[in-house]
A protein has these predicted regions:
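Transmembrane helix-loop-helix hairpins at lipid-water interfaces of multipass membrane proteins
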Residues: 37-94, 174-179, 290-294
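Membrane-integrated ABC transporters
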Residues: 1-51, 66-80, 98-102, 106, ...
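ABC-type nucleotide-binding domain
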Residues: 350-602
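Transmembrane helices of ABC transporter permease
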Residues: 32, 36-49, 87, 154-208, ...
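An intracellular "coupling" helix at the cytosolic face of ABC transporter transmembrane type-1 domains
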Residues: 32-35, 126-127, 143-152, 156, ...
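Helix-loop-helix
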Residues: 67-69, 73, 172-186, 260-329, ...
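Juxtamembrane helix-loop junctions of ABC transporter transmembrane domains
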Residues: 11-19, 42-43, 50-63, 87-134, ...
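Helix-loop junctions and hydrophobic alpha-helical segments within the transmembrane domains
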Residues: 117, 121, 230, 331, ...
Length: 602
């Protein structure tokens, strides 16, 4: 089907709603951690209260107790010490909880988001992966979610502690000296305004930085996945140049980011220096005028730190917040993207009674491009083996990809036993179809785990029987670790024929009524091809089977051979019938078995 991914494009009025929706979505991840969040909040409040209390305690003692007699002071020191020890022990416990369990809360939220993101990736249709780079998707799963986790933890901590300390210290500062506090508030307002505009500038820089690290991840994933091709073409220098180009672009964006951060931090520090200078000079003038006591200025200086430090923390946190916000936006973009292929409302499980497949006037195009399938009509009878041949790009693989709904038809219909495949659930449809492809993918794990992929409940006996039917059991049993042998990522420790037969064993174990064999032997040597072909012949018995093959020797015995060209069925018949027609199939046969006569393509 054409691209139907739904991404909201908010206008001016929708922008606010989108921000609210984004905020509500973010808050929803706190819900499972609400008890931890409440405790974290309580500890943060206690920390703020203790921080605010100490300068006031010092001021009271200096103005009161410490002006009394020596005996009075010494007699009270034990009680003061005990009180402060208790207070700072509570401070220690709360600080430990906020730092450790606050981060654990963020990590749990990150873990849940990572699961949700992976689930979203698994839901996406093939067309989504046709449009997106793997490195970018990996970056969202790792880098973005780490930044979101930091925001989830430090956001409430800095806001709760910071706002309490700012409000509390401001009230106390005003209580000590109103004019000086108004000056302080004015300078703080300049700090906030400066921070607002600086963040607007840095937001674009952070976004650029994320794009560059995604490019690095994509280049790395591409080079490592294709390392055998790289080595085979001695193209290491070429790959190094490509990687260094993307890495250099990332370095430039990161240098730009750090320069912006440096300018920002330096400007903030300069403003803080101005603030301290103004307070000290103005406070000294007030002391000289008899409008303020020296102890009040000393206490005032302590509270300035309590007033400005949380402001600095909150302003500095905006860097983390910007990264987290950018990451969460990218995160929600994926969660809100609807897969192109979805179950219809009320979709039922497919019921395979015979295995008859009908393509009726099927049209298909990739992403609004030129049609690949153009009015295709096929009738594949139950239990028959039908081979599709034709030129590369003629539509053979696309024809097979439409059957399990990896893509949806643009128009027309495909039915199995009279059931339109769009009216049944994807899970039941794909469970009814077994696929053996040219490019076999084995997962990092044991041979047994790979054979049982899709059937994790299979017993050892079932796995061994499937391997035997696929003509791979003897080889597996000759290995020191047998079925527990590690295959390596993508099956790198096995030959092409061995991997192919393991993939066939998978399908034997799955035991589906429908089968698709897509160039299953084209990459094998003659000996491996014979072994695999025997396995495939056994596999195709009593199943409706679609076969794609360029090696005509593998499909001569098919019940019917259909030539696909330009997305249409242009010839059909048995091997002998098509040779007699002298058409495209006969031309291919002559090229493979009787030389390559100069016959125009039909």
């Amino acid at each position: 089907m054409l691209d139907r991914s739904s991404r909201p494009v908010p206008g001016n009025n929708a922008s606010g709603k989108h921000r609210k929706s984004l905020f509500a979505s973010f808050l929803s991840y706190y819900a499972p951690q609400k008890h931890l969040f409440i405790l974290d909040t309580i500890c943060a409040i206690i920390l703020a209260c203790i921080e605010l209390a100490f300068p006031q305690i010092l001021r009271s003692l200096t103005k009161g107790l410490f002006t009394q007699s020596k005996d009075a002071i010494l007699g009270s020191l034990v009680f003061i010490a005990v009180g402060l020890v208790v207070m700072y022990f509570v401070h220690f416990l709360c600080r430990y909880f906020v730092i450790s369990w606050g981060h654990i809360m963020g990590a749990r939220m990150e873990s849940k988001m990572r699961e949700d993101l992976f689930d979203a990736y698994e839901r996406m249709s093939f067309s989504y992966y046709d449009r997106h780079k793997t490195g970018d998707l990996m970056s969202r799963l790792v880098s973005d979610l780490f930044d979101i986790s930091e925001t989830a933890h430090h956001g409430p901590e800095y806001l709760i502690i910071g706002l309490l300390e700012i409000a509390g210290s401001f009230v106390i500062l005003a209580f000590i000296n109103v004019p000086l506090t108004l000056v302080l508030a004015g300078i703080a307002a300049v700090l906030v305004v400066f921070n607002f505009f600086a963040n607007m500038h840095m937001r674009g820089i952070f976004k650029e930085n994320r794009m560059r690290i995604s490019d690095v991840n994509t280049q790395l994933e591409d080079s490592l996945s294709g390392i055998r091709v790289v080595k085979g073409f001695a193209a290491e220098d070429h790959e190094r140049k490509k990687f260094r180009a993307s890495n250099s672009a990332y370095l430039d964006s990161k240098a730009n980011m750090y320069q912006a951060m440096g300018r920002y931090q330096a400007a903030i520090s300069g403003m803080m220096g101005v603030l301290n200078t103004v307070v000290l000079v103005l406070g000294g003038w007030m002391i000289a005028q008899g409008q303020m006591q020296a102890i009040d200025l000393a206490t005032y200086a302590l509270y300035i730190s309590l007033f400005t430090t949380p402001i600095m923390n909150i302003l500095n946190f905006t860097e983390t917040f910007q990264k987290g916000l950018a990451g969460f936006k990218r995160f929600t973009e994926i969660l809100e993207t609807q897969p192109d292929i979805q179950d219809a409302p009320g979709a039922r499980d497919i019921q395979i009674t015979a295995g008859e497949i009908i393509y009726q006037d099927v049209h298909f195009a990739y992403n609004n491009a030129e049609e690949v399938i153009d009015g295709l009509n096929l009738h594949i009878e139950s239990g028959k083996t039908v081979a599709l041949v034709g030129p590369s790009g003629g539509g053979k693989s696309t024809t097979c990809a439409l059957l399990p709904r990896f893509y949806d038809v643009t128009s027309g219909s495909i039915t199995i036993d009279g059931q339109d495949i769009r009216s049944v659930t994807q899970h039941s449809l794909r469970s009814a179809i077994g696929m053996v492809q040219q490019d076999v993918y084995l997962f990092d794990g044991t041979i047994a785990e790979n054979i049982a992929y899709g059937c994790p409940e299979a017993s050892e006996e079932d796995i061994a029987l499937a391997a035997k039917r696929a003509n791979i059991a003897e080889f597996i049993e000759s290995l020191p670790d047998g079925y527990d042998t590690q295959v390596g990522q993508r099956g790198t420790r096995l030959s092409g024929g061995q991997k192919q037969r393991i993939s066939i064993a998978r399908v034997f174990l799955k035991n589906p009524p429908l089968l698709i064999l897509d160039e299953a032997t084209s990459a094998l040597d003659n000996e491996s091809e014979r072994a695999v072909q025997e396995s495939l012949s056994e596999l195709a018995k009593n199943r409706t089977t679609l076969v794609i093959a360029h090696r005509l020797s593998t499909i001569m015995g098919a019940d019917e051979i259909i030539t696909i060209n330009h997305g249409r069925a242009v010839e059909r018949g048995t091997h002998d019938e098509l040779l007699e027609k002298g058409g495209i199939y006969a031309h291919y046969y002559q090229m493979q078995f009787g030389g390559a006569p100069n016959i125009a393509r039909r």
